[in-house]
Amino acid sequence: MMNFIRTLLIYEIILLKIYHIIKLLHQQQVVAYPTEAMFGLGCDPDSEKAVHTLLTLKKRDWQKGLILVAANYEQLANYIDDNSLNINQRARMFSLWPGPITWTIPARTTTPCWLTGKFSTLAVRISAFKPVRMLCLAFGKPIVSTSANVSGQSPARNICEVRQQFGAAFPVMDQIIEGRYSPSEIRDAISGQLIRRG
């Protein structure tokens, strides 16, 4: 019984943290949150203002494009061209999802360039990490996912490292990362080709 109560309290604390972060996302702010391997910077992918702020904070070239992380495939429907994938390509993707694999999929023509950068594809991932899934489910859509670091510096693996790079008042979802040490692997969904080793 005590373990059950402890589990409920932990989930309640996580939910309170998530709803605080969601409030900031709705205000077009950039936040830091835990992922499988490191802390990520995230924002509302539909807000050009928020994405511009994120890119400025990271000192990242917009042409490189960004990754969206989602709780499920349905959340990606407004951003990717699912019709461009055949049954085998979909099966290959879903055999590795949810998990730390990012796939580049042809983007919809309506997907903004601040997400795709110079590419006609969009990098997307369905996370298996419970805090990320809960965050995306509560937000009702994917969030931008990029490592929490200024370009050229090491990715932040804890709250102190996030705040060293982005300031003591930077909003962070206080949660322990899963323990992986490498970023997500990136593959092309059409060809299966490895783009970045994880």
UniProtKB/Swiss-Prot annotation:
Known catalytic reactions: L-threonine + hydrogencarbonate + ATP = L-threonylcarbamoyladenylate + diphosphate + H2O
Top-rank EC class of the record's enzyme: transferase
Signal sequence coordinates: none
Keyword entries, A-Z: ATP-binding, Cytoplasm, Nucleotide-binding, Nucleotidyltransferase, Transferase, tRNA processing
Coiled-coil ranges from the UniProt annotation: none
MF (Gene Ontology): ATP binding; double-stranded RNA binding; L-threonylcarbamoyladenylate synthase; tRNA binding
Statement: the UniProt record of this protein carries the keyword Transcription regulation: no
GO biological process assignments: regulation of translational fidelity; tRNA threonylcarbamoyladenosine modification
Domain YrdC-like, residue spans: 15-198
The enzyme's E.C. designation: 2.7.7.87
Entry-linked Gene3D superfamilies: DHBP synthase
CC annotations in GO: cytoplasm
One Pfam family, short name: Sua5_yciO_yrdC
Keyword Nucleotidyltransferase part of the UniProt annotation: yes
Classification via PROSITE patterns: YRDC
Compartment list: Cytoplasm
Family: Belongs to the SUA5 family. TsaC subfamily.
Annotated function: Required for the formation of a threonylcarbamoyl group on adenosine at position 37 (t(6)A37) in tRNAs that read codons beginning with adenine. Catalyzes the conversion of L-threonine, HCO(3)(-)/CO(2) and ATP to give threonylcarbamoyl-AMP (TC-AMP) as the acyladenylate intermediate, with the release of diphosphate.
HAMAP family named among the record's database cross-references: TsaC (MF_01852)
Name the record gives this protein: Threonylcarbamoyl-AMP synthase
